[in-house]
Amino acid sequence: MARILLLTLLHPLPENPARGAFVADRIRLLREMGHEVKVVNTLPRMLKIHEQRRSTMQGVAKAPRQFEFEEHPVLTVRYTAFPDHPFPSWTSASIKRQAKRVENWLGDWRPDLVSVHTLWPAAILAQKLASRYSSPCIATVHGHDIEVGLSANYSSIIIQLEKSVQQLVVVSDKLAVKMPNSVVIPCHVEVPEKLQRPIKKWRGRWRRGELEVLFPANSKRPEKDHYLALQTCRELETRGWRVKIGDLPNVPRNIVHDRMHACDIALITSRRESGPLVAREAIVCGLPVVSVDIGDMKSWLPPHCIAKERTPEALADAVEAVLKSEETIQLPDIFEKEHVSKELEKLFTRLLKKS
């Protein structure tokens, strides 16, 4: 058993239980593996009105200094940042100053490992704490740091952080190509067994029946390209389908799974993804998926589920191909909880032997 201090920019909040659900899954898994985990949620200082800039920021402004999640305490530390980070050195200095508060919160408890989810800017604080406790530091990148951060004005800090941690973990092979010294440990699929369903062949009136489409994201997030999903539904309607489409606006996980059970197909139109966890959850819930060619989708989804082009017509063709198909879709073992826990255990053992 290891004592793990986990810092994360993304974590469920009292007013936003959907924020960072994939990080909460990892924390839960670590505890199931027998590790003792203490969680620090790094958040920017902001006014309530500024939450409207991005739906993922809902609940950030008024998040308490400390709260409980699944009966475990979570410490919130704040840093100062401006939109688009015009002063990255200011942000770095701001988050470093929170180290003392974290140390006071931990008291006599000393971590064997420091783990951080996302590099900018949480890894700056993680590195300082790892140095303070002489512990190895692991950084897990979910996509934004690489796909957006490497072209931002703080890219040099991200490159420096990536080189300074003892191990960089990425969640997909696509990200590993850009970070050659990383190891791939994907996010596992966390769907209760009682909610898991096999995918059944669609039964209905071809090009006349009703089609319930799930847009498995918050439609307000521009990178998810809700407009393309709407265009696809309009194209399906011109072919005779009666289409309804709904999204998932920051709702708890149980409601996500309920919506997946109620719909006929999930439609993913994102402009930027590393490995859409929601697509895997949909498959486990028995909901077929149609997607643009994004992230790692091609590595495990059958070809007929991937649109040949990023157009409403190509996506509508893929939707109809999936509805006709009788092919079963099986998730690879790498997304199973057992595989992920084994890979994490191997990583921890190797790093703790070195330290």
Regions found by a protein language model. Name each.
Residues G149-A152, H188-G209:
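Acidic anion/phosphate-binding donor-loop and adjacent secondary structure
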Residues I199-K201, K324-S355:
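A charged, aromatic-enriched C-terminal amphipathic alpha-helix characteristic of glycosyltransferases
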Residues D258-C263:
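Short alpha-helical donor nucleotide-sugar binding micro-motif in glycosyltransferases
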Residues R271:
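Aromatic "clamp/platform" in nucleotide-sugar-dependent glycosyltransferases that forms part
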